[in-house]
Regions:
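Rossmann-fold NAD(P)-binding glycine/threonine-rich loop
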Residues: 101-123
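Oxidoreductase and adenylate-handling cofactor-binding alpha/beta cores
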Residues: 133-149
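N-terminal Rossmann-fold NAD(P) dinucleotide-binding loop
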Residues: 13-14
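ADP-ribose/adenylate-binding Rossmann-like module
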Residues: 89-107
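C-terminal catalytic/substrate-binding lobe primarily of soluble NAD(P)-dependent oxidoreductases
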Residues: 145-442
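Helix N-cap at the beta1-alpha1 junction of Rossmann-like dinucleotide-binding domains, i.e.
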Residues: 36-40, 104
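Conserved N-terminal Rossmann-fold NAD(P)-binding element of oxidoreductases
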Residues: 4-8
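Conserved Rossmann-fold cofactor-binding substructure of NAD(P)-dependent oxidoreductases
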Residues: 58-70
Length: 442
C-alpha cells in the first residue's frame, strides 16, 4: 500500500484530499492528512477507510521527519514559507514532494541535491501558478512545432463570484485569502510591450486596466501582475516582444478599489492608534485633511474628485465604511481594518458558488500570416467548501502526485510543470474532470 502524506487541510486542500480518498481503493493508497487543527484534518478525511487524520506541528522536527519517512510521497499545502523545511527533509529522506506554491530561492537551491538523491520536488502545480503554466505551454509548444513565431503573449486569471450569485455592486466576493486581495499589487508591476520594458507603480496600477470578454461569462478588466518578465525564461520566450500577466476583476472594480489605494487605506506598514475603538467612519476620516465643516462623505468626494452619485462612491458606501460600526481590532494596520470591513460584505454566503476565469491571448506569425488565438477557461464551484478555487488548485496537485506514484512522471530535481511529460497527462485528466480550455481564433 502506497502512503501519501498531505500536510495541511485548509481551504485549498479539500478537493485534493477528496480526490485522493476517492481514488485510494483502486490505487491501494493510504492517505494521511496532517494539520495543526485535528478538527480540520478529521473533517477532510470524513472517516474514509483509507484515510487517517493526525495532529501535526511542522516545527516538531521529530514528528515531521517520522511522518515524512513513513510516506511514499509528500504533498505540502502548508503556507509557502514552510515548504523549505519540508523539502529539505524530503531530499534527505529520499521522498518526492509536490506543492502548489511558487519556487522560492531556497527551494531552487535544492535542485542539485534533489537530483543527486533521485528526488522530485514538483512546485507551481496549482491554478496560478500551475494550470496557467501547463495550458500556456501546451499552446506555445504547438505554435512553435507548427512553424509559428510568437510575437505577443498575455495571460489573465481571476477568482470571482459565480454569475448566479453576483449580487453586490462590486460584482466581487472573497473566494480566496482576503489578505492577499487587500494587499494585491503592492510593489511595481513590470512587463514588456513591443520590446520595451514597462513599469506601473502601485499608485497607478488600478488605473491601467485592459478590458476583455471571456467566453459567455461577460466583460472583465485586467490589471498587471507584479512581475511578468520572468515568464520569458520559464516559457522559452526569451525574445518575445510583448509579454504581460494580469489579474481579472469585473468591470468597474478597479476604479473603485483605486480609491482605497489613493487614500493609503491598503497600507500594511504601520498600526493605527487606538484602532480597536475607532468607528469605520472615523477610520476613513483619518486619511483626509482636517476640515470640520464638511461631512466625511463630502471630504471623500472632494479629496478624490468624485460626485456622490458616482458608481465609485456607491460601491464604497455599500461597504458600510461611512457607518459607526466599531473596528474592534487592536493594533491594526490600515490594511487589516480595510480587510475586516470588506470581509463583512464580501464573504460567500452559505449557498454561494465561485468562479475561476482564465484567458491566454497569443499573437503569432505563421507562414507569413499574423494570427491571434485566445485560450479560455471557466470553472464553477459546487458550494462554499468545494469551490472552483479549491478544485483548480487541488486537482492538479493530486493528479501529479498520482502520476509520480505510478511512475508516469520520472523527473528529478526542482521542477515546475512546463514540460510535456508533466503537462500532457495532467491536462488530460483535468479535462476528464471538467477543467478544459476553449480555443478561439480571433
Amino acid at each position: 500500500m502506497k502512503k501519501i502524506l498531505v500536510l495541511g487541510a485548509g481551504r485549498s486542500a479539500v478537493t485534493l484530499i477528496k480526490y485522493l480518498l476517492e481514488n485510494s481503493i483502486s490505487n491501494n493508497w493510504q492517505v494521511t492528512v496532517a494539520d495543526f487543527s485535528i478538527e480540520l484534518a478529521e473533517r477532510a478525511v470524513a472517516n474514509h477507510e483509507n484515510g487517517k487524520a493526525i495532529f501535526f506541528n511542522v516545527t516538531d522536527e521529530i514528528q515531521r521527519k517520522s511522518e515524512i519517512e513513513n510516506a511514499d510521497i509528500v504533498i505540502s499545502m502548508l503556507p509557502a514559507s514552510l515548504h523549505i523545511t519540508v523539502a529539505k527533509d524530503c531530499v534527505s529522506l529520499v521522498k518526492n514532494m509536490v506543492t502548489a506554491s511558487y519556487v522560492s530561492p531556497e527551494i531552487a537551491d535544492l535542485d542539485e541535491k534533489a537530483k543527486q538523491a533521485g528526488v522530485l520536488l514538483l512546485n507551481e502545480i496549482g491554478l496560478d501558478p500551475g494550470i496557467d503554466h501547463m495550458s500556456a505551454m501546451q499552446v506555445i509548444d504547438e505554435i512553435k512545432e507548427n512553424g509559428g513565431d510568437l510575437t505577443s503573449f498575455k495571460s489573465f486569471c481571476g477568482g470571482l463570484v459565480h454569475p448566479d450569485y453576483d449580487n453586490n455592486p462590486w460584482n466581487y466576493k472573497f473566494t480566496w485569502n482576503p489578505r492577499n486581495v487587500v494587499l494585491a499589487g503592492q510593489g511595481t508591476a513590470q512587463y514588456i510591450k513591443q520590446g520595451n520594458y514597462k513599469y506601473i507603480p502601485y499608485t497607478k496600477l488600478f488605473e491601467r486596466t485592459e478590458l476583455m470578454e471571456v467566453l459567455d461569462a461577460g466583460e472583465f478588466e485586467g490589471y498587471a501582475n507584479r512581475d511578468s518578465l520572468g515568464y520569458r525564461y520559464a516559457y522559452g520566450l526569451e525574445d518575445i516582444p510583448t509579454l504581460f500577466r494580469g489579474t481579472l476583476r469585473r468591470k468597474g472594480y478597479c476604479k473603485a478599489w483605486n480609491m482605497f489605494v489613493q487614500l493609503g487605506m491598503t497600507d500594511d506598514t504601520y498600526e493605527v492608534e487606538n484602532s480597536e475603538n475607532l468607528t469605520y467612519r472615523a477610520f476613513i476620516n483619518l486619511f483626509f485633511p482636517y476640515n470640520n465643516e464638511l461631512s466625511v462623505e463630502q471630504k471623500f468626494c472632494s479629496y478624490l474628485n468624485l460626485s456622490q452619485d458616482s458608481e465609485e462612491f456607491s460601491k464604497i458606501e455599500w461597504l458600510g465604511i461611512f457607518t459607526d460600526t466599531i473596528v474592534g481590532l487592536k493594533d491594526a494596520t490600515p490594511a487589516k481594518i480595510l480587510q475586516k470591513i470588506c470581509e463583512e460584505k464580501w464573504t460567500l454566503d452559505s449557498e454561494d458558488k465561485d468562479m475561476i476565469v482564465m484567458q491566454h491571448q497569443f499573437e503569432y506569425v505563421q507562414n507569413g500570416e499574423q494570427k491571434k488565438l485566445n485560450s479560455s477557461l471557466l470553472v464553477f464551484g459546487d458550494d462554499p467548501r468545494y469551490t472552483s478555487m479549491a478544485k483548480t488548485v487541488g486537482l492538479p496537485v493530486a493528479i501529479a502526485a498520482k502520476l509520480i506514484l505510478t511512475g508516469k512522471i520520472k523527473s528529478t530535481g526542482v521542477k515546475i510543470p512546463t514540460t510535456k511529460n508533466i503537462y500532457i497527462p495532467v491536462l488530460k485528466e483535468l479535462e476528464d474532470n471538467g477543467i478544459n480550455f476553449v480555443e478561439e481564433l480571433v
